[in-house]
């Protein structure tokens, strides 16, 4: 009996390790772009919830500031901040836009997308804005761990895109970063195996 239990334990551990390895491989091999372009029509900065008092959260701050740096570096002449009031009453796009303007970005270079409730909708609504302005390419800025899943969504679109990582917030520990990577790697593995759930926001993602 003890011998059988040991064998089962070994099998379980082996399966867990295999799943971890598979997750890492899938996560690390997701393409980060579909183009060789280095300059784009716009920079899409993906939202994340603000603090309960409406101030930028650490990741929201870093994503915004990186978008601003890319804008000032001439990567694109415009910024789309995307994200609605998904997890509290504050519209993520508006919080980020205010921060960007405080860093010297003119309001005329900013478009706020304030409806999206998740990453799929971030891309869907941002693409609509691009079409309205005849913008054909985009650099997409988000937190490092979030970008592979974002790329899986972007693969539904044929316009030229590239993902770009914002720095981790200085206040995040290595453990916090590891947790973010682990959660996202697991999510990407599931999406590679089972695909995305049916969604009208992906159904029409053909351009």
Regions found by a protein language model. Give the residues of each.
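A structural signal for short, hydrophobic/glycine-enriched beta-strand patches
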Residues: 24-181
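Hydrophobic alpha-helical segments, especially transmembrane helices
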Residues: 7-8, 64, 191
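Hinge/cleft segment of the Venus flytrap/periplasmic-binding protein
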Residues: 205-207
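A transmembrane-helix-recognition feature enriched in membrane-embedded lipid enzymes
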Residues: 174-201
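Short alpha-helical segments used as structural interaction elements across diverse proteins
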Residues: 3-4, 60, 146, 187
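N-terminal type II signal-anchor transmembrane helix
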Residues: 2-35
């Amino acid at each position: 009996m003890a011998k059988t239990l040991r064998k089962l334990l070994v099998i379980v551990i082996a399966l867990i390790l295999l799943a971890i390895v598979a997750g890492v491989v899938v996560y690390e091999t997701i393409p980060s772009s579909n183009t060789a372009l280095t300059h784009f029509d716009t920079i899409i900065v993906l939202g994340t919830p603000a603090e309960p008092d409406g101030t930028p959260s650490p990741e929201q701050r870093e994503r915004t500031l990186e978008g601003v740096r890319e804008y000032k570096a001439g990567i694109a002449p415009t910024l789309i901040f995307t994200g609605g009031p998904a997890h509290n009453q504050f519209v993520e796009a508006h919080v980020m836009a205010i921060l960007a303007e405080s860093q010297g970005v003119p309001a005329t270079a900013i478009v706020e997308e304030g409806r999206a409730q998740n990453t799929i909708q971030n891309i869907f609504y941002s693409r609509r804005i691009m079409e309205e302005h005849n913008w054909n390419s985009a650099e997409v800025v988000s937190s490092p761990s979030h970008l592979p899943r974002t790329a899986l969504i972007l693969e539904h679109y044929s316009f030229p895109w590239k993902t770009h990582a914002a720095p981790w917030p200085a206040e995040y520990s290595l453990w916090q970063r590891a947790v973010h990577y682990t959660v996202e790697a697991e999510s990407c593995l599931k999406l590679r195996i089972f695909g995305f759930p049916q969604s009208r926001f992906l159904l029409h993602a053909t351009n």
